[in-house]
A protein has these predicted regions:
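Bacterial N-terminal signal peptides that target proteins for export
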Residues: 1-7
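A beta-rich soluble binding module of mature secreted/lumenal proteins
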Residues: 13, 18-169
């Protein structure tokens, strides 16, 4: 039995479902993102996870610019606990023409592409918030595995101002 016709339906179930908000305001975003500077490792500090990430611990998102201009992503995590073996996912990102580098499409499997908006990025490229217009998933990430309490609180306030339900955030 061929499974390929079912893959798009499975992808919608995995990535398209979630608790979305009725907030329809456009997400904020920086005036521009220097995509090559954005590349590298980002530690997930807090997030409202997608279905595959719900049991992710010790998560790191790594980006590398490919020769074709797309972004090779490696999401490493430990499923279920900090002691679990490391697992990874390998979606490919594409920077959209509009958005000055802040709007990407992230493809986990063809032809499904998820919205990926860099909604906030500090000037030093050390902290970021990646969001979706549906307000169903959000990621607060930093270049280091820990941030100060003040930075964390400011990020949570930014996420709330975007219209997210803070009770869904995982730390």
């Amino acid at each position: 039995m061929r499974m390929f016709p079912l893959l798009p339906l499975i992808a919608v179930g995995l990535f398209g479902s979630g608790c979305s908000s009725s907030d329809t305001r456009p997400l904020p975003r920086p005036p521009s993102v220097d995509v090559p500077r954005f590349m590298g490792d980002w530690y997930v500090i807090a997030h409202i996870p997608s279905r595959p990430e719900r049991e992710a611990f010790d998560a790191v998102e790594s980006y590398a610019l490919r020769p074709d201009g797309r972004i090779q992503t490696t999401f490493t995590y430990r499923k279920g606990s900090f002691d679990a073996p490391q697992k990874s996912m390998h979606p490919v990102g594409r920077v959209e023409k509009e958005g000055n580098g802040a709007i990407w499409g992230m493809q986990f499997m063809w032809p499904i592409q998820a919205e990926y908006v860099i909604a906030w990025l500090d000037e030093s490229y050390h902290q970021t918030i990646v969001a979706r217009s549906k307000r169903d998933y959000v990621w607060y990430m930093a270049r280091t595995p820990q941030v100060s309490d003040s930075d964390y609180q400011q990020a949570v306030e930014r996420i709330a101002a975007m219209g997210y339900d803070l009770s869904l955030i995982h730390i």
